[in-house]
Swiss-Prot record:
Signal peptide: none annotated. Pfam families: Semialdhyde_dh, Semialdhyde_dhC. GO terms for molecular function: aspartate-semialdehyde dehydrogenase activity; NAD binding; NADP binding; protein dimerization activity. This is Aspartate-semialdehyde dehydrogenase 1. The keyword Transport does not apply. Inhibited by S-methyl-L-cysteine sulfoxide in vitro, via the formation of a covalently bound cysteine at the active site Cys-134.
Length: 370
């Protein structure tokens, strides 16, 4: 299968390439690399020679492919996808961008949760597969065991989202902000006799100063947070909050009888792991040990963390999870509102299960089925 790769140099694309090398995906395909800026230079070698870089906007070149995997972003998809389909191309389009997620012709792909839907689509002519919103995918990886049994009446998700979700430049800016804050009070920190209130005042002054680096976030994130992600919708939700309900229900195949999902999406100073505090209204009172068993056995990556302080502090954090495929779930307990209310907290890497991993796994599924 000739597979075109677009956006492979960006942050998500780089993680995708790393995972495809680790899983030897390149052994199974003929890779064709595309670029929007460096056409004609040698393509990267991920275990086999791929010739030269091709023009990512050349419809005739793209038409020669059996599949395209793109991490190039929404504007690329908006320009190229309709033109390619209108030109008669009938290959598989596998996309990280949000542009096509809610299109009827597209399946939001997360195979540990909706493999049956993916296989049905492949066997019935679906050719467009799109990775889901990062928080949605990570939430479903964590709680798939409850959703597949139809046990969730509604859910509220309060998110703690990493800088990586906003892009590579935002990650750099977060680190720069941390450095500027440290530099502003480094001499005071080195002096044990200095007043922490004086240090705190200086930190606040630094964060509020006009020279503080905020070109990307617009406001300080280090030492602070931003309780808004993406644009505003008419009902007062942010678009990120809207995605939780519509995308999760599409992945679960529940558009006709959706589970209400809503909450507040917040950007915090983590690098690349999103965390979520979840309030789950169950349809019935289920013993906690049974809930834990359902969650833990749903897929190979979810991990139930006992609701104890020390192991939670060690295992249920971005620092522990970053760079791994593990999706730990903890703080599992019944709530004061009633025994049919469940509290949970989960963490996952935004660039792996939140972005790159579903794309490469979709390619492997297509290869296996075809």
């Amino acid at each position: 299968m000739r597979v075109g790769l677009v956006g492979w140099r960006g942050m998500v694309g780089s993680v995708l390439m790393q995972r495809m090398v680790e899983e030897r995906d390149f052994d199974l395909i003929e890779p064709v690399f595309f670029s929007t800026s460096q056409i004609g230079v040698p393509a990267p070698n991920f275990g086999k020679d791929a010739g030269m870089l091709h023009d990512a906007f050349d419809i005739e070149s793209l038409k020669q492919l059996d599949a395209v995997i793109t991490c190039q972003g929404g504007s690329y998809t908006e320009k190229v996808y309709p033109a390619l389909r209108q030109a008669g191309w009938k290959g598989y389009w596998i996309d990280a961008a949000s542009t096509l997620r809610m299109d009827k012709e597209a399946i939001i792909t997360l195979d540990p949760v909706n493999l049956k839907q993916i296989l049905h689509g492949i066997h019935h002519g679906t050719k467009t597969f799109v990775g889901g919103n990062c928080t949605v995918s990570l939430m479903l990886m964590a709680l798939g065991g409850l959703y597949e049994r139809g046990l969730v009446e509604w859910m509220s998700a309060m998110t703690y989202q990493a800088a990586s979700g906003a892009g590579a430049q935002n990650m750099r800016e977060l680190i720069s902000q941390m450095g500027v804050i440290n530099d502003a009070v480094s001499s005071e920190l080195a002096n044990p006799a200095s007043s922490i209130l004086d240090i705190d005042k200086k930190v606040a002054e630094t964060m509020r100063s006009g020279s503080f680096p905020t070109d990307n976030f617009g406001v300080p994130l280090a030492g602070s947070l931003i309780p808004w992600i993406d644009v505003k919708r008419d009902n007062g939700q942010s678009k990120e909050e809207w995605k939780a309900g519509v995308e999760a229900n599409k992945i679960l195949g529940l558009q006709d009888s959706p589970v209400p999902i809503d909450g507040t999406c917040v950007r915090i100073g983590a690098m690349r792991c999103h965390s979520q505090a979840l309030t789950i209204k169950l349809k019935q009172n289920i013993p906690l040990d049974e809930i834990e068993e359902m969650i833990a056995t749903h897929n190979d990556w979810v991990k139930v963390i006992p609701n104890e302080r020390d192991i939670t502090a060690r295992e249920l954090t971005p620092a522990k999870v970053t760079g791994t495929l593990s999706v730990p779930v903890g703080r599992l307990r019944k709530m004061a509102m009633g025994d049919d209310f469940l509290n949970a907290f989960t963490v996952g890497d935004q660039l792996l299960w939140g972005a790159a991993e579903p794309l490469r796994r979709t390619l492997r599924i297509i290869l296996a089925e075809k």
